[in-house]
């Protein structure tokens, strides 16, 4: 239970800290995916669950990067570097 509380606290701290731009938010999401993957490996949960989670995390990464590239194409590099997530 303490581990879950610490992970939630880290998630909200990183979410508050990385609320600067979209790329930092994507890096935060990948950090959380790697944390959950280590949790699955550490507790030796079913290998099929590991593969399914790995497939979903790769799809999430590809979707996020494609959104970043399309936003860079539409808005331009200068506007993307100062854009906030709330925009």
From Swiss-Prot:
Catalytic reaction(s) noted: a ubiquinone + NADH + 5 H(+)(in) = a ubiquinol + NAD(+) + 4 H(+)(out)
Membrane topology: Multi-pass membrane protein
Enzyme class: translocase
Keyword Calcium: no
Membrane-spanning segments: 22-42, 49-69
GO molecular function: NADH dehydrogenase (ubiquinone) activity
Main location class: mitochondrion
Keywords tagged on the record: Electron transport, Membrane, Mitochondrion, NAD, Respiratory chain, Translocase, Transmembrane, Transmembrane helix, Transport, Ubiquinone
GO cellular component: mitochondrial membrane
Localization: Mitochondrion membrane
Record-listed E.C. numbers: 7.1.1.2
Domain of life: Eukaryota
Family: Belongs to the complex I subunit 4L family.
Protein's job: Core subunit of the mitochondrial membrane respiratory chain NADH dehydrogenase (Complex I) that is believed to belong to the minimal assembly required for catalysis. Complex I functions in the transfer of electrons from NADH to the respiratory chain. The immediate electron acceptor for the enzyme is believed to be ubiquinone.
Protein name: NADH-ubiquinone oxidoreductase chain 4L
Lineage, highest ranks first: Eukaryota, Metazoa, Ecdysozoa, Arthropoda, Hexapoda
Annotated gene: ND4L
